């Protein structure tokens, strides 16, 4: 594999990143209808800079090979939308948008991206990382467990079985 460069996303990359996120969402969740996908993409585009680039508890990293986007990961301030979770009261972020292009998988890129993201979060004063994933996403739960996350709760919904996970960061 060619050399990979991991960088903090910039405002001029937003259209490309939102396009990539939209494509990844269609691959991971093929059962979502096009209208829902379009609404999510529009919302993502409108809020990307505010949530990922301008917010002190936001970040977004890209991995590129020879200028080509091959993977992404980010975090945003946790919005409290799952009140049943027992998360820290302050400085909690939600890890989002980990995606590695299929031809680049199993090369350690996701682990490298996450390690840099966790380091950035720690330097930003983040106390806890939260994420949710689903068992139908190949290797997702195992990957996060290998990276220090613990399962907090699993929704009983038979389709999504949303798996809520968290990891405390060292002070």
Predicted regions and their residues:
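Conserved N-terminal entry element of GNAT/NAT acetyltransferase domains
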Residues: 1-15, 171
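Conserved GNAT-fold acetyl-CoA-binding loop/helix
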Residues: 5, 25-49
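Conserved beta-strand in the GNAT
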Residues: 62, 68-77, 94, 99
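A short, polar/charged loop-to-alpha-helix boundary motif
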Residues: 79-88
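Conserved acetyl-CoA-binding loop-helix of GNAT-fold acetyltransferases
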Residues: 100, 106-119, 145-146
């Amino acid at each position: 594999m060619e050399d990979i460069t991991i960088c903090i996303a910039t405002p001029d990359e937003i259209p490309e990143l939102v396009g990539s996120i939209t494509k990844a969402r269609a691959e991971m969740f093929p059962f979502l209808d096009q209208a829902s996908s379009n609404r999510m993409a529009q919302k993502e585009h409108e809020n990307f800079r505010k949530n990922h680039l301008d917010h002190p508890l936001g970040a977004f990293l890209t991995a590129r090979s020879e200028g080509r986007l091959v993977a992404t990961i980010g975090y945003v301030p946790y919005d409290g939308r799952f009140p049943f979770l027992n998360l820290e009261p302050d400085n909690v972020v939600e890890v989002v948008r980990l995606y590695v292009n299929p031809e680049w998988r199993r090369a350690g890129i996701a682990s490298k991206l996450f390690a840099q993201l966790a380091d950035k979060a720690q330097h930003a004063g983040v106390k806890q990382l939260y994420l949710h994933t689903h068992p139908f996403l190949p290797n997702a739960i195992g990957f996060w467990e290998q990276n220090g996350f613990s399962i907090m709760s699993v929704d009983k919904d038979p389709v999504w079985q949303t798996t809520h996970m968290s990891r405390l960061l060292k002070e």
